Amino acid sequence: MTNTIVELFDKITAEQGLGRSLDHEGSANYAVQKTLVKVATDHFIRFGYRRANIAEIALDAGIGKGTIYLHFKNKRELFFSCLIAEKRELLPQLEIIENFPEEERLRAFLEVTFSFALTASLTRALLSRRQDFAALIEEIDATILKNHDQNYTEYLINKLISPVTHNLDTDDKKTITNVINLATLAIGYLPEMAFDLPGQEIRTEEFVRTLAMIIDRGIKNT
């Protein structure tokens, strides 16, 4: 069983085919990898997966094309490593939430993950521009995705849902995690203009807090 968000993150990123974390800060490779991930993230956001070009990424990063392959096996591993780096920015906030009182954890977790879905540029590109990443999606091993979902569901149930629900069986709790996942995906699909329509401006912070509150109360009242 995964006990902490860091353990969950390490377990998921250890899966073959889902990218790799950067070498530890201070290592000889760290600075190069950090630059590559930063530049590659920008290229993937601008051009999508298929049109992003390794040679152009290397050029903008100021290194030789061959150097990329010393750190990342191929373009797919580089892309997923960019996703990992983006998601790793969430860890400090989620680690703090793990120390909250049980009644407060779920809502805080929802607020952070919903906010991430609205602001994480590469994740949003992957969700809202599926046609630009279709080639990548087709390459992913279904077993890897199944393991990823299983580990994430286990964490949500054990750490966030079970402590605040007492009348639900395992299937009910899995259904709740599916709802949370679908809500997060739906937010990722929202275009930025949805929050900036003339006369209908919606503060993203207010939207996130309200949605998290509704889901949190709904779960606790079941």
What is each residue range found by the language model?
Residues 91, 137-166, 174-178:
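Amphipathic alpha-helical packing segments from all-alpha helical-bundle domains
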Residues 116-143, 189-194:
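Amphipathic alpha-helical segments used for helix-helix packing
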Residues 31-42, 46, 60, 77-100, ...:
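Alpha-helical structural segments
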Residues 89, 116-123, 183-190, 214-222:
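Phosphate/oxyanion-binding loops and surfaces in catalytic or ligand/nucleic-acid-binding neighborhoods
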Residues 56, 101-105, 172-175:
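A conserved beta-strand->loop->alpha-helix hinge within the catalytic CA
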Residues 5, 123-128, 164-211:
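Hydrophobic/aromatic-rich alpha-helical bundle segments in the mid-to-C-terminal region
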Residues 1-47, 51-63, 77:
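Basic, helix-initiating cap at the start of DNA-binding domains
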Residues 61-72:
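Short hydrophobic/aromatic patch on the recognition helix
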